[in-house]
From Swiss-Prot:
Homodimer. One of its GO terms (cellular component) is cytosol. It is found in: Cytoplasm. It catalyses: tRNA(Thr) + L-threonine + ATP = L-threonyl-tRNA(Thr) + AMP + diphosphate + H(+). This is Threonine--tRNA ligase. Belongs to the class-II aminoacyl-tRNA synthetase family. It comes from Shewanella halifaxensis (strain HAW-EB4).
Length: 642
């Protein structure tokens, strides 16, 4: 007679084994109708799974985040059901849940078109509308294999052969005539899978290996109700308008081309953005007392072997050879920084030593994963490494945290999620060392009043890590900042310092990044601001326009004055109507549009308007220059107001 303990502490006793659905029905018909799955003793289970012993149970509905993930997973099965009905010759591969949705990889000779995607979505809706029940059957490994062999599902057989032990009992989910295999859980009825949309189709290699066959990957999104789906689709529509690749082309910031995949060709205005961002970070480095260094672009393979990177990253490293020596272009800066640290004897009095670099790194990312500025092969890291004693770890990490938040605040990012990854099973050092390291990070976070989530076992083998994920105006998550303790690399590369007792000790190394890469962060900023950069960051801060040729010399004088003040100004003396000029520069997102006619010229004034169309009226030239210069120096996010 199992006794079921619910989240509120109440208990229910049953005469026979029960399922989550049975318990929900015992509580009330409304909950039974809403029940998607259950969390039994901390483990997600299908609503139909039998509970035989005393257990703690949480009933999962579509109101729960886990419930939405489950219905998304079931929508992947629904997609498979529709695909097999419309394209029976398809071989099904995998269909997992992803952020906000799902996908299914399929092997189909016919290349899916938008018309096919529309037809699949229509068929999915028709199937879901019947509210058919999903039948879960737990079978032997051999029965599962026989089932998929009879259906010609080569990929399902490969999963069984290569990933599932023969003594296991896989779960087969029957969607009417369609059968899929999954660890679950899934919805008990397709009534929960009514609010979805198929988004796109792309190529994907089987098992992510380019040596394998290219499959077609159909993406979809699914939500608990129509309102949530509509909000998501509207957000995607807004994201498409803000796409940094589209805006980058409109504003002539950069381009990429086939001859240099994943490498950025910065144009004048884009490079201005890059340099301004670099300048800002460089000022932060000075504020937080960092040295700035510059290491070589490539180093001998032997060094990468000693550092351990060759074993882990060699597939992602670009290599070359010269005079019978093999070199690797650096994918990261840390080994080079240890080489700089190793030059000359270091004392405990020299620590902490904070070393930063705008390091040009390269990684041979798969071509299919490249995405504008967000995923590139050549990038610049705002990378730093702090060499310190173990006693200094907490204060140094605390300073890193302050620097991260100071930096993000300048760009208007305040919604930051922080996660602390702790010791994995396979790790160096003893538990005492890990206890001290993890406690130092926790204390540093708490000292800065930072709420954080702990990810048990997710740290690197050489030390725990803090990750900073910022959320943009569309509530998209971007993992940018990291603070990683490293107890391994300094020792591998022979870094030591003379301790107070004259013994040689190995320093702790703190890897610190704030932006991650400048390229990716600029992509984030382009989309966050929709190309309307704050004045301090804008490639062109002011454009000065004349009404007639009579004001041309005055316009030249105005622009020259701005440049003397360090303001990035340009002029537009074209023989066009002023309304046309204003519209054009508004579309180019120039923060301030200045118009001068005869009256402004006579009074040494400018007529000021913003790109948002706000008329700030006439100002004395020096007055406006001073106000703008002050706004730029403060790195204000807002434009001047009337």
């Amino acid at each position: 007679m199992p006794v079921i303990t619910l989240p509120d502490g109440s208990k229910r006793e049953f005469a026979n084994p029960v399922s989550t659905l049975d318990v929900a029905a015992d509580i009330g018909p409304g909950l039974a109708k809403a029940c998607i799955a259950g969390r039994v003793n901390g483990e997600l289970k299908d609503a139909c799974d039998i509970i035989e012993t005393d257990s703690e149970l949480s009933i999962i509905t579509a109101k729960d985040e886990e419930g939405v993930e489950i219905l998304r997973h079931s929508c992947a099965h629904l997609l498979g059901h529709a695909i097999k009905q419309l394209f029976p010759e398809t071989k099904m591969a995998i269909g997992p849940v992803i952020d906000n949705g799902f996908y299914y990889d399929i092997d189909l000779d016919h290349k899916l078109t938008q018309e096919d995607i529309d037809a699949l979505e229509k068929r999915m809706a028709a199937l879901a509308k019947t509210n058919y029940a999903v039948d879960k059957r737990v079978v032997s490994w051999q029965e599962a294999r026989d089932t998929f062999e009879a259906r010609g599902e080569d990929y399902k057989m490969a999963i069984l052969d290569e990933n599932i032990p023969k003594d296991s009992t896989p779960a087969l989910y029957h969607h009417e005539e369609y059968i899929d295999m999954c660890r679950g859980p899934h919805v008990p009825n397709m009534k929960f899978c009514q609010n979805f949309k198929l988004m796109s189709v792309a190529g994907a290699y089987w098992r992510g290996n380019s040596d394998n066959k290219m499959l077609q990957r159909v993406y979809g999104t699914a939500w608990a109700d129509k309102k949530a789906l509509k909000v998501h689709l509207n957000r995607l529509e807004e994201a498409a308008k803000r796409d940094h690749r589209k805006i980058g082309k409109q504003l002539d910031l950069y381009h990429m081309q086939e001859e240099a995949p994943g490498m950025v060709f910065w144009h004048n205005d884009g490079w201005s953005l890059f340099l301004e961002l670099e300048k800002f970070i460089r000022q932060k480095l000075g504020q937080y007392t960092y040295q700035e260094v510059k290491g070589p672009l490539m180093m001998d393979r032997v060094l990468w072997e000693r550092s351990g990177h060759w074993d882990k990253y060699s597939d992602a490293m670009f290599t070359t050879s010269s005079e019978n020596r093999e070199y690797a272009i650096k994918p990261m800066n840390c080994p080079g920084h240890v080489q700089i640290f190793n030059q000359g004897l270091k004392s405990y009095r020299d620590l902490p030593l904070r070393m930063a670099e705008f390091g040009c790194c390269h990684r041979n990312e798969p071509s299919g994963s490249l995405h504008g500025l967000m995923r590139v092969r050549g990038f610049t890291q705002d990378d730093a490494h702090i060499f310190c004693t173990e006693e200094q770890v907490q204060q140094e990490v605390s300073a890193c945290i302050r620097m991260v938040y100071d930096t993000y605040a300048t760009f208007g990012f305040s919604n930051i999620v922080v996660k602390l990854s702790t010791r994995p099973e396979k790790r160096i050092g003893d538990d005492d060392m890990w206890d001290r390291a993890e406690e130092a990070l926790k204390k540093a976070l708490k000292a800065n009043d930072i709420e954080f989530e702990i990810l048990p076992g997710e740290g690197a083998f050489y030390g725990p890590k803090i990750e900073f994920t910022l959320h943009d105006c569309l509530d998209r998550a971007w993992q940018c900042g990291t603070v990683q303790l490293d107890y391994a690399l300094p020792g591998r590369l022979g870094a030591t310092y003379v301790a107070e007792d004259n013994s040689r000790q190995t320093p702790v190394m703190i890897h610190r990044a704030i932006l991650g890469s400048l390229e990716r962060f600029l992509g984030i900023l382009i989309e966050e601001y929709a190309g309307k950069f704050p004045a301090w960051l804008s490639p062109v801060q002011v454009v000065v326009m004349n009404i007639t040729d009579k004001q041309s010399d005055y316009v030249d004088n105005v622009v020259n004055l701005f440049k003397e003040h360090g303001i990035r100004a340009t002029k537009d003396l074209r023989n066009e109507k002023i309304g046309f000029k204003i519209r054009e520069h508004t579309l180019r997102r120039v923060p301030y549009l200045l118009v001068v006619g005869d009256q402004e010229m006579e009074n040494n004034e400018v007529a000021v308007r913003t790109r948002e169309g706000v008329d700030l009226g006439k100002m004395q030239l020096e007055e406006f220059a001073t106000k703008l210069k002050n706004q730029i120096s403060l790195r204000s996010l807002n434009l001047l107001e009337d």
